[in-house]
């Protein structure tokens, strides 16, 4: 009887233990977050966050994925193959308005990654005809070259930042944009295409302007910071699911990137950053070209000498000025689409900006990181254009050059 009782107690105890085991939930490992990038110097915040272990520090497992073009980045963000990417600030605006994709598709702008650091490169056809920042001579130079052949310029994505810098330069120079060809070429392919005479000029990010000068294929005519000092350039752009369902993970990613941006703005760290960027799995361009322009030293090519940028080279943090995603900047890009004929009527400027800019999320992250949030919706002016008031786009469009 006692033996039977002991066996019963043993079975009950074992059953209880097994029940405890089966009900115990083993924590699931953190999912891998995939972020895309293009081979450009300004992918540095993502690369640095990875190489310094900052993503791991903030508790996220991030895989960086090198992409072939901005169109591929767009498609992978939208279909969920990647969670987000180093991306042209204006690309979500271009896609949403139907310029660079199917209208109504949403990609969210979480934060700005950098200011400045792009340029317009002209081919050797222009060498000796127009020099560095000689915008007033550019139209005559184009006509000069057109006397020998058709002139084509390249940018990287319709409605993207490079497209808009190129068109702003043309407007300032008085170049009729319908008199030249404008084509789309992925950033890493710019130099090769100029080498085989597929275009006479292009607008792209570094290091591909510096590489053209170093290889004596073209020269730097003007940098983007000369067109608009401290302009927004690349952004962390994410799909809607990452911005909502995985909001806490996104915040961790943003914190890691902000710390990387701070690290990058210590000039003494830029040589190390360049040594990472030069690797084949990242930018795959000459170390000396990446490093020099990252430090603000531009060997222009065409025997034009070296231009030293003292405070408006490529910046990633700049005491907190860089990273706030601004609705006013989004509205400016939307206004450019109307200005240059991409859109035939005014879009819902504020509505689109509010839909695509994650300014509230950035404010949360900034507060937790003690990063200042910059004021928004204020008027500002670019170098060659009239003042832009985001609250009165109509007045701007009446007076700006087209």
What kind of region is each of these model predictions?
Residues 1-10:
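Bacterial N-terminal signal peptides that target proteins for export
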Residues 9-20:
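Bacterial N-terminal signal peptides
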Residues 26-177, 181-183, 196-212, 217-230, ...:
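Short, glycine-/small- and polar/acidic-enriched structural segments
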Residues 40, 67-71, 86, 157-161, ...:
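Soluble non-cytosolic domains of exported or imported proteins
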Residues 120-121, 235-238, 242-243:
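Short glycine- and hydrophobic/aromatic-rich loop-to-beta-strand nucleating segment
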Residues 245-358:
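Secondary-structure end/capping motifs
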Residues 331-402:
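Conserved C-terminal helix/tail region of periplasmic/extracytoplasmic solute-binding proteins
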